[in-house]
Amino acid sequence: MDYFPVIFSLLFVTFQGAPETAVLGAELSTGAENGVQSPPPSTPWRPRRSKRCSCSSLMDKECVYFCHLDIIWVNTPERVVPYGLGGSSRSKRSLKDLLPNKATDQAVRCQCAHQKDKKCWNFCQAGKELRAQSTMQKSLKDSKKGKPCSKLGKKCIYQQLVEGRKLRRLEAISNSIKASFRVAKLKAELYRDQKLTHNRAH
């Protein structure tokens, strides 16, 4: 058999990689002497962004503003835009992070980086409660504070009936919106699961 092409290609690959490994080994040895480890020369060093917490949704601008400490927020005529969000280095994520539990996904607004950060923890928990409280619940409280109709007559009773119908209609609309969001979320999770299994197959 003719082993010459195989040996030649192996030697070529070995000698091409040798200078880089020699330089890398020299840098690691000098870094070890100084007590500082430098990053490999092939990847440029980028500072990691300091994050107070991780938002469950980047559409929640208040959460993003609270969690990302080093973003410069620029006011534009249309909206407030985070400047410098792109190009940040990401650490590798586990499969557990890609497919969060349904209970934690619905319940938690964000996850704090440090467990002892009480302000962050209160923000994430308060955000969950604020989102759960709807305008319908506020209007129910307002209607309970209304005047009793015993002295005011039929007009007051009619007005309360109309407001009751409006509240029931608002409740039906909010329930249908919640149901449509649940369906969309389930479809997105199903698509994500199919995409992950498809990527693993190839």
Swiss-Prot record:
SMART domains linked: END
Broad class of the protein's primary localization: secreted
Entry keyword annotation includes Nucleotide-binding: no
InterPro entries the record matches: Endothelin, Endothelin_toxin_CS, Endothln-like_toxin
Stretch list, region Endothelin-like: 110-124
Propeptide cleavage-removed residue intervals: 26-50, 74-202
Tagged with keyword Secreted: yes
Stated role: Endothelins are endothelium-derived vasoconstrictor peptides. Probable ligand for G-protein coupled receptors EDNRA and EDNRB which activates PTK2B, BCAR1, BCAR3 and, GTPases RAP1 and RHOA cascade in glomerular mesangial cells. Also binds the DEAR/FBXW7-AS1 receptor. Promotes mesenteric arterial wall remodeling via activation of ROCK signaling and subsequent colocalization of NFATC3 with F-actin filaments. NFATC3 then translocates to the nucleus where it subsequently promotes the transcription of the smooth muscle hypertrophy and differentiation marker ACTA2.
Name under which the protein is recorded: Endothelin-1
Source organism (scientific name): Mus musculus
Lineage, top ranks: Eukaryota, Metazoa, Chordata, Craniata, Vertebrata
